[in-house]
Curated annotation (Swiss-Prot):
Organism the protein comes from: Geobacter metallireducens (strain ATCC 53774 / DSM 7210 / GS-15)
Signal peptide range: none
Protein name as catalogued: Deoxyguanosinetriphosphate triphosphohydrolase-like protein
Classification via Pfam families: HD (PF01966), HD_assoc (PF13286)
InterPro entries on file: dGTPase, dGTPase-like, dNTPase_2, HD/PDEase_dom, HD_domain, PHydrolase_assoc_dom
Region of interest (Disordered), residue spans: 1-23
Keywords: Hydrolase
């Protein structure tokens, strides 16, 4: 990778020795003549914010389909929450906040409409054609699919951002396979490791909020979860006259704080115990250092188990999943059978990428709303085309 001149003096001078630094980046795929001197990771963050795929996250959902209500989280609000949590952790660990923020904002760019159901459906439909995995799709978005700059496709992000995207993992993800450009088998930067946990902290706690708002879960049910009960009771003791709604919101806020404090304390202990003083040390030791303590990890496991059984498998969520699968399957099969239904620029890509992959890219880029409207246009006789 090569890179034009980017700002070096503007980078924080108080970063920990094991932090990633823009000045030490492995560079970009394409050399550019930059018009200003922003540090590399700051530029990456800005490019992600201004790309089309990031804007579309506003109408891609987490658990609830977009038209179910305006209150519920979308992929955009989730990404912003991950960025806030990730930066808070990065600041406490003394690592690069700009790289952390860039990774947070990019981590869901490859997500399909209709949450994880969309990913599961596309992966089944793409069996025999390379499959589908949202981390790899996020990489495709920033490396190939965005069309903004003269001379190249993609966003031409720094090597460290791309590495963090392809090595992102959460309980929903599967291994993304070997990508030779990004040190396969080697742990990513601490900033990338932070995002794995910030992602989980954000969706666990904010799915509680959305689940309570929807009525799919109740406070009585949550009181059976040890960690929630401890914090919920603590808020009541601290604020005896607090109303139930504010108590709920303050409990969620305090839970996030509990996770951040435990994660940073445990991670710093790991860094010190392993005597990691540089990014090279981290790569050489090749062990993740960002982690919860065993006690908090167990409490978090129970919280996730509660959400899985009571929210993600709620019968109304299951109904949304079944409908979403029908929409995406019929769209995919129709586009593959009749490629002229796609915009011309996608038809032109089929000779190079193959019909199925182009259709997959097109559907993966849809918002919930666009997918629903497209389904109506194709399959409802009185809908305008």
């Amino acid at each position: 990778m090569t890179e034009g001149v980017e700002g070096r003096s503007q980078e924080r001078s108080d970063l920990a020795g094991f932090a990633a630094r823009s000045a030490e980046s492995r560079g970009r795929k394409y050399q550019e003549a930059f018009r200003d001197h922003r540090p590399a990771f700051e530029r990456d963050r800005d490019r992600i914010i201004h790309c089309a795929a990031f804007r579309r996250l506003e109408y891609k959902t987490q658990v609830f389909v977009n038209h179910e209500g305006d209150y519920y989280r979308t992929r955009l609000t989730h990404s912003l929450e991950v960025a806030q949590i990730g930066k808070a952790i990065a600041r406490r660990l003394g690592v690069n906040e700009e790289l952390t923020e860039a990774l947070a904002l990019a981590h869901d760019l490859g997500h399909t409409p209709f949450g994880h159901t969309g990913e599961e459906v596309l992966n089944r439909l793409m069996e025999g054609f390379g499959g589908f995995e949202h981390n790899l799709q996020s990489f495709r978005v920033v490396d190939q699919l965005e069309e903004r700059y003269p001379g190249f496709n993609g966003l031409n992000l720094s090597w460290e951002v791309l590495e963090g995207i392809v090595k992102h993992s959460s309980p929903y993800d599967r291994p993304v396979g070997v990508i030779d450009r990004f040190l396969p088998g080697v742990v990513p930067t601490i900033e990338a490791q932070i995002i794995n946990y910030a992602d989980e902290i954000a969706y666990n706690n904010h799915d509680i909020d959305d689940g309570l708002k929807s009525g799919f879960i109740t406070l009585d049910q949550l009181d059976g979860v040890e960690l929630w009960r401890e914090v919920h009771e603590g808020i009541a003791r601290a604020y005896p006259d607090i109303d139930p709604e504010r108590r709920k919101l303050q409990t969620i806020s305090a839970l996030i704080g509990v996770f951040i404090k435990d994660l940073t304390t445990t991670s710093l202990e790991n860094v010190q115990r392993l005597r990691i003083t540089s990014l090279d040390d981290l790569r050489r030791i090749n062990r993740p250092v960002v982690a919860f303590s065993p006690a908090t990890a167990e409490k978090n496991r129970k919280l996730k188990g509660f959400l899985f059984e009571n929210l993600y498998r709620h019968y109304r969520v299951e109904r949304m999943r079944v409908k979403a699968e029908r929409y995406l399957r019929q769209l995919f099969e129709s586009y593959v059978k009749h490629p002229t239904l796609l915009p011309r620029k996608y038809q032109k890509k089929m000779e190079i990428l193959g019909r199925e992959r182009v259709v997959c890219d097109y559907i993966a880029g849809m918002t919930d709303r666009f997918a629903l409207d497209e389904f109506k246009r194709l399959f409802e006789p009185y809908e305008r085309v």
